[in-house]
Structure formats: C-alpha cells, structure tokens
C-alpha cells in the first residue's frame, strides 16, 4: 500500500492481423490499474482479455462481423474485503451489416455470454443474451446520424441479488434496455456540431437519460 501513488495504469496489447476476403484479427490484452485516490487505501485491478474479430463479406451488400472474447478480472482492495472480486467468462457478438447504398446501412446483432466468479466471499454465475440494432445515415458531406439500440437479459444462477459491474459486459441481472443516438453536422469546413442522447433502463438505472451537445471549431 503506497500512499504516495494516486493512480497508475499499465496496458499491453499484442495483435495479429490477416487480411484478404476474410479479415481476421486476434489479440491478447493485459491491463493493470492502481487507484489510490481514496485516502483509506488502494484498489488494484488486473484484467486479461483474448479475442478474435472476423469480418466476412457474404455477398454484395451484406457483411458478417463476429467478435469472440475470453476475459478475466480481479480486484483487490486494501480498503475493505467487501470490494474484492474476481471473475472470468466469455462474450460473443455477431452482427449482420446490410448496406442499402453508400449513405445508409443497418447492423443487426446477436449477443451472448457467461461469467462466473466470487464477490463479497459469495460465488455467482450469470448468463446473458440479447439483440442490438445499429442504423447509420450519411447526409451528403455535411452530416451523420447514428442510432444504436440494445436489449439484453441476464440471469443469475446462484441466487445472488446483484453481480459485479464488470460482469457480462456491464449488464446487470434482469432486462436491460439501452440506446445511443448521435448527430454530427458540419456547419462549414471549420465548424461542426455534435449532439448525443443516451438512455438506460435496467435494475441499476431507472429511465436514466443523458444529453450532450458540442460545437467544434477547427482553425
């Protein structure tokens, strides 16, 4: 426990890429994060991830994307043992991208995953599955509109009332609905506006809505 260190982050990543008609990317990533802002002590988080990305053109106008990930997570705290947690699991996200023309496409995705581990000295095991739809529209050279909607159901198998926030890609027990809408509009070559609207409705956040607007100038 070094009280003189407030925050320390270390990341390493190795990638291997195969290009062609079928593009494959494999990676291994390691993250170590020390959070010492709390005067009571430090939290040390270690996470490891290995995965494969696959991009395949089925035929003109249809691409298939698949990401499979294996991951592990471990948090140890000198503040309280109740903050300690460890878990491992997997997540798979497959998307079918339909391109209608150069300015519009739709992604329809299926997500499934599982995670198990220990939190507060209790074991947990959770399965999750859901769908995701992403729509992108380009308006000439002046704007871009994108909407993403996801619905995921997570089920806990060991009667735990909650799971760690890192489990199954951050989805809590029960039904989760999330949406993200972004509008990027270029007023001129040097000025642009970005608006984003996010919504979350699940067991952690009840009808949570955030809105953000930006005006960007490039000189």
Language model region names:
Residues 1-219:
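Exposed, low-structure sequence patches enriched in small/polar residues
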